[in-house]
């Protein structure tokens, strides 16, 4: 023990100086460099100790892999980026996201042949004049051909119908060649469910155009049509049935259609069907197929869901109903379309909203554009249609009270290239599932949520075409419009604005209650100030320079008498205001009739200011466009 202590003291006394330690470190580094160079030349030398200690200690698994490489892969240099790969794996998925983006960029191809489609389908595409696939088609076609149950999510007008119909037709032809399956009466192999009759007709029309070359038979069964012709069509050999859930269930109940051979199921506009009460019908249709869903190979069936929007509630419902389904989304899902311009017109409330609509609509019609005017209610739609008819503007209607056959006729008139009825006045019934060539979408009534906004704007700028969206923003809609504009400027998804069914009352609290104001919006105090200043850090909804706020206390004076007896001062202050300077303006504003066009347009010419997120502002843009 004494000798050990003496040796320890000797070592402490003979500790090397800092200069000596620096020399030893340089010698060690030189040895490391020499050993590494020799290892690169011979490719069999093991890593030196300094190299091993310079990085993290290798695991036992890595050492075994290195020994196997040295034994069986002589002459192959060791993979240098291994430490970086290990760090990437420990980093929490940052590298995985980059790899996914790179893979998605590689999947976007320039021709349909690279997607694995056959000659018959390619001939049908050539007849339709389509040569280059869209992003959703590049993502969806290979997935459906591989037999995967998927949810295809992409913005409206991106080609989702062809994204599932093209591979579906090829799968039907493959089953005929490999499994000997053929057409049978009342036993379709593919079923496409759609929420509306109009979307059913659209999908059926595309399927018919493909069937001219692919040689398969499809039929359409939808509500609002006679049942007898549909029964006769189902009693003939059929491959695919396109229809609405309720009518298909009726035919199954009556024995006109059976489940036996169904292998492929498509739910078009799936978010609409789950969000608008089609859930029970879909569950009833899926009940006999649940047992077959878990069977492997050709005994099961494949499900494809197509949607333009997806709230978290609907996504959760889909994941519960379809276990193991894969979600495939494009980069533009639930975002603005790059080829569409969005303008917002702030209305203070004193203007005539119908006259503002006329001022926006007339220049667009003068350019030969086809325009859709969206309203929130039937009464609003009737009022707009009556007003435009009085001003010699030809219109057609599309809402719930218009009979189904008349709606089809109105759509044909609107599609007519001669332009006899270039204006379609409609409700949200026309916001989904209609493939129309629309140049301009005007929102007379601003929607109550961003999902409806996306569907309305999806009627224009379809398949890469240019379009324009103009929104008349009332005071109660300012906050939601501001948030939508901010999200579009940042190219963010609009789904977050409708989480848990957010409506205007929840998004816009400063108009339902005078207490408190939102942090995202700076509203000028309502006590007698002249203008409404609507400013955010990124929003460009324009200031309204009217003097409506100056007149608002006088209009609300009778309310002060009835609501509170102690507020006699506002009533007395109204008497001297008759002789004050603002009185002539008040007198001019009250007798102004709403039906007159002359004075209203002169005043609106200085009030309407259009601001789009591309930076084009001022009233000139409203007149120029």
Curated annotation (Swiss-Prot):
Broad class of enzyme this protein falls into: hydrolase
Residue spans of biased composition, Basic and acidic residues class: 591-600
Keywords linked to the UniProt accession: ATP-binding, Helicase, Hydrolase, Nucleotide-binding, RNA-binding
Binding site for ATP: 154-161
Spans annotated as Disordered: 36-59, 72-103, 505-625
Span of the annotated motif DEAD box: 268-271
Superkingdom classification of source: Eukaryota
Aminoacyl-tRNA synthetase is among the record's keywords: no
EC number: 3.6.4.13
Domain Helicase C-terminal positions: 353-503
SMART domains xrefs: DEXDc, HELICc
GO biological process: mitochondrial large ribosomal subunit assembly
One term under GO cellular component: mitochondrion
Pfam families: DEAD, Helicase_C
Reactions the enzyme catalyzes: ATP + H2O = ADP + phosphate + H(+)
Single GO term (MF): ATP hydrolysis activity
Limits of the Helicase ATP-binding domain: 141-328
Segments of skewed composition (Low complexity): 36-51, 567-586
Extent of motif Q motif: 110-138
Domain notes: The Q motif is unique to and characteristic of the DEAD box family of RNA helicases and controls ATP binding and hydrolysis.
Annotated family: Belongs to the DEAD box helicase family.
Protein name (database record): DEAD-box ATP-dependent RNA helicase 39
The organism of origin for this protein: Oryza sativa subsp. japonica (Rice)
């Amino acid at each position: 023990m004494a000798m050990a202590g003496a040796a320890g003291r000797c070592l402490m006394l003979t500790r090397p100086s800092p200069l000596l330690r620096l020399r030893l470190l340089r010698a060690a580094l030189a040895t490391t460099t020499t050993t590494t160079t020799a290892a690169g030349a011979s490719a069999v030398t093991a890593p030196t100790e300094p190299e091993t200690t310079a990085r993290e200690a290798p695991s036992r698994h890595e050492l075994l892999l290195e020994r196997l490489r040295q034994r069986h892969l002589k002459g192959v240099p060791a993979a240098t980026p291994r430490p970086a790969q290990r760090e990437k794996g420990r980093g929490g998925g940052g590298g995985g996201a980059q790899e996914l983006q790179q893979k998605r960029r590689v999947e976007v191809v320039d021709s349909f042949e690279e997607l694995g489609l056959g000659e018959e389908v390619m001939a049908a595409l050539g007849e339709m004049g389509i040569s280059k696939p869209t992003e959703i088609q590049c993502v969806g076609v290979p997935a459906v051909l591989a037999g995967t149950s998927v949810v295809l999510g992409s913005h409206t007008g991106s080609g989702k119908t062809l994204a599932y119909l093209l591979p579906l037709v090829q799968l039907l032809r493959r089953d005929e060649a490999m499994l000997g399956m053929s057409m049978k009466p009342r036993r379709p192999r593919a079923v496409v469910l759609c929420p509306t009759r109009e979307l059913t007709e659209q999908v059926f029309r595309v399927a018919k155009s493909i069937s001219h070359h692919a040689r398969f038979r499809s039929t359409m069964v939808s509500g609002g049509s006679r049942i007898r012709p549909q029964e006769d069509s189902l009693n003939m050999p059929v491959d695919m049935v396109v229809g609405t859930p309720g009518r298909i269930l009726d035919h199954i109940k009556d024995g006109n259609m059976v489940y036996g051979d169904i292998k492929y199921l498509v739910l078009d506009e799936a978010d609409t069907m789950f969000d608008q009460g089609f859930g029970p019908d879909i569950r009833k249709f899926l009940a006999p197929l649940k047992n077959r869903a878990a069977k492997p190979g050709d005994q099961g069936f494949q499900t494809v869901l197509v949607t333009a929007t997806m709230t978290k509630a609907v996504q959760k419902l889909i994941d519960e109903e379809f276990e193991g389904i894969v979600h495939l989304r494009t980069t533009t899902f639930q975002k603005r379309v790059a080829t569409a311009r969005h303008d917002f017109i702030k209305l203070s409330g004193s203007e005539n909203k119908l006259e503002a609509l006329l001022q926006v609509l007339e220049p667009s019609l003068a350019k030969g554009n086809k325009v859709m005017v969206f309203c929130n209610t039937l009464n609003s739609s009737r009022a707009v249609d009556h007003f435009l008819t009085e001003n010699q503007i030809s219109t057609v209607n599309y809402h719930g009270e218009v009979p189904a056959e008349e709606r089809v006729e109105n759509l044909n008139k609107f599609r007519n290239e001669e332009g006899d009825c270039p204006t379609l006045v409609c409700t949200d019934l026309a916001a989904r599932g209609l493939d129309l060539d629309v140049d301009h979408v005007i929102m007379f009534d601003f929607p109550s949520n961003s999902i409806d906004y996306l569907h309305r704007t999806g009627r224009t700028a379809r398949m890469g075409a240019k379009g324009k969206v103009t929104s008349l923003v009332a005071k109660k809609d300012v906050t939601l419009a501001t948030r939508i504009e901010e999200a579009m400027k940042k190219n963010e998804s609009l789904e977050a604005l409708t989480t848990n069914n957010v409506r205007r009352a929840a998004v816009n609290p400063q108009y339902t209650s005078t207490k408190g104001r939102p942090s995202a919006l700076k509203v000028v105090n309502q006590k007698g100030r002249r203008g409404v200043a609507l400013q955010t850090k990124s929003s460009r909804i324009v200031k309204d320079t009217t003097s409506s706020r100056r007149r608002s206390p006088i209009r609300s004076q009778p309310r002060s008498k009835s609501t509170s007896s102690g507020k006699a001062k506002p009533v007395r202050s109204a008497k001297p205001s008759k002789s004050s300077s603002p009185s002539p303006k008040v007198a001019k504003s009250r007798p102004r009739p709403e039906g007159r066009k002359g004075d209203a347009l002169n005043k609106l010419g200085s009030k309407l200011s259009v601001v789009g997120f591309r930076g084009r502002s001022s009233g000139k843009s409203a007149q120029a466009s």
